[in-house]
A protein has these predicted regions:
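Chalcogenol-based redox active-site neighborhoods
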Residues: 1-184
Length: 184
């Protein structure tokens, strides 16, 4: 399968997820890209559970989840860890480097195929780079950015880009919601 390209259909996926409130007996529900049809999706990959930069990104998105919901967007985090690792991390307090209180699910790309399809898999390490993809309600990839493993992503920038995409217009450099769009 070709790598994900902006302006084309996002690579399909089906993965097991851990949801807030799951137990070891209830975790592992499957979710597919088609489950998000009709909504915007912020799909992001991160290297590993129980690491250092990852919880700062994951909790920053979670703390502003309502803002994404107001924009008609869902969030799905993905790593190559198991759903059981995700669940254990979700049940770990934030002060202990956990992500307790998470507002959205984490998916398990245990086969690493989804990270490969989106072009973020570090093959020799079996982990994903910090890739973030915004997929529109029709399943078309509209935005992608991939960061170095050491650099966390900006929730402000993710929200700004989502809002810019939703205008359908030409947004100049440093555009912010409420500012003028370019006219042709």
């Amino acid at each position: 399968m070709p790598l994900a390209k902006v302006g084309e259909a996002a690579p399909d996926f089906t993965m097991a997820i851990a949801r807030p409130g799951d137990t070891p007996k209830t975790t592992g529900t499957k979710i597919s890209l088609s489950d998000y049809r009709g909504k915007w999706l912020v799909l992001f990959f991160y290297p590993l559970d129980f690491t250092f930069v990852c919880p700062t990104e994951i909790t920053a998105l979670s703390d502003r989840y309502e803002e994404f919901e107001e924009l008609g967007a869902d969030i799905l985090g993905v790593s190559t860890d198991s759903v059981y690792s995700h669940l254990a991390w979700m049940n770990t307090p934030r002060e202990d480097n956990g992500i307790a209180g998470l507002q959205y699910p984490l998916a398990s790309d245990i086969t690493k195929q989804v990270a490969r399809d989106y072009g973020v898999l570090v093959e020799d390490q079996g982990i994903a780079l910090r890739g973030l993809f915004i997929i529109d309600p029709n399943g078309v990839l509209q935005y992608s950015v991939v960061n170095n493993l050491n650099i966390g992503r900006s929730t402000d920038e993710t929200l700004r880009v989502l809002q810019a995409l939703q205008t359908g217009g030409l947004c100049p450099s440093d555009w912010k919601p409420g500012k003028s769009l370019l006219s042709v």
